[in-house]
């Protein structure tokens, strides 16, 4: 192993039986040149406690003779040697970021003041016999600061006489050029690359504080009254500004303050009385404003026909639930001669949007929020304005079990609707009434089918309001069957009505009868409700021209897949559905029950 006086330094490893290294391999270390280092002398009082011999004494029994330098070399240059085992320096090497090479001698950058007259550098020779394979696997030069070494080992190598305190890794760079500066720079760049991402992660972990948004004041809220001094300031500011146009606000404030101090008590009382009167007015206005805030209900409706909702709600009787039905119908080709819809029509070809805002203070605990159910374009709301306008107390907002049953059945039927619009609403109801055949046994049986085929224009259902409960259904068959069939309803509760749409006659000749329900609401109800199913099969040559199924409309139907080619326009579909629904609601509100005669 030759170091001094040579341009190239070679380090031979003689460790026995290492799995990676052999005794013949040599490692080339970079040359530090032939420069000589001059260390300026530092005059300090000698202290026997600062001797290195005490530290060396602790490690005499652990040292390796092979690692000790030549005596002549030590005598000539005054080098103090400190032999330390690898077990003590392993932790230091790892924590300072450097890795030991094979047989590397670690030279301290900073000198240590000792009681000797010369200022010798301290060299640490690491014995290679106890090296572990993990450290031998690396061959990277490492420069260790003396202050870091002493702090990691817990050894006071120089006591309090260490020249430089522990600094951050970036402060170890010397401003003056030195032979070891290039190695140190490389180590510091590696250190920066390792520590830079950690600092970024720490900065990103901090969540920025979101500024609190100030609540906007209501412009309708009454303003607080001014104090007596503010009133005086407002009156005198204009006069002072007129005399001194260039006066600043601070100067004007000082002048007004001096004038207020010199003002008499009686004049101050005038301003104070004004303030008291303004405060009373403010309290009254504030109480009125809060009362309006509690009782105000803002209802904004974006619709094609805004006054349609109150007009429809005014027609429904008081006991029935307030239900607004808006149907979304796609546009189809309509006849130019179609009648214009009345002002009571709610639905339009475009879907309406309803926005209802109800303050929580008005509603009771059970109705803290307005219930809005939407399914297939049907919106059901109970706004508070309608209930209060009818004179109903808020305690009656809870619907009766009958109203809940009606609303629930209507919503269930709407949810079970196919995407295609079915105009007759009576076909969307559940629980069809059971029909019993009262004719003789030789007559064919009647079967109810739920899915209606294309409907014929000659078959009608006439429904009129009635006060007594009896309900009779008469079926007049075609001329092939001379005897009429009388079928009466067995179901006593008319919660949901389903009109049969087709009949199958298994007897010869087989024939299917199709019924088109058309509801005609009469103004004067007769004493009983008669529903007649008139099924006639005229000759094909005499079949009249088809018409719109809505009552009172004589226009021919328009081909549209959304209403089975039965209506002439969107308005007829809406009016037909509305009339049928209103007739059903009025029947339910009167508590009519079907009985069998």
UniProtKB/Swiss-Prot annotation:
Does the record bear Nucleus in its keywords?
yes
* Disordered: region residues: 160-187, 199-224, 522-547
Q: Which GO MF terms are attached to this record?
A: chromatin DNA binding
Q: Where along the sequence lies the DNA-binding region? A: 222-290
Where would you say this protein principally sits, based on its record? nucleus
Recorded GO cellular component terms are: nucleus; PTW/PP1 phosphatase complex
What do we know about how this protein assembles, alone or with others? Answer: Component of the PNUTS-PP1 phosphatase complex.
Q: What is this protein called?
A: TOX high mobility group box family member 4-A
UniProt source species? Xenopus laevis (African clawed frog)
* Gene assigned in the entry: tox4-a
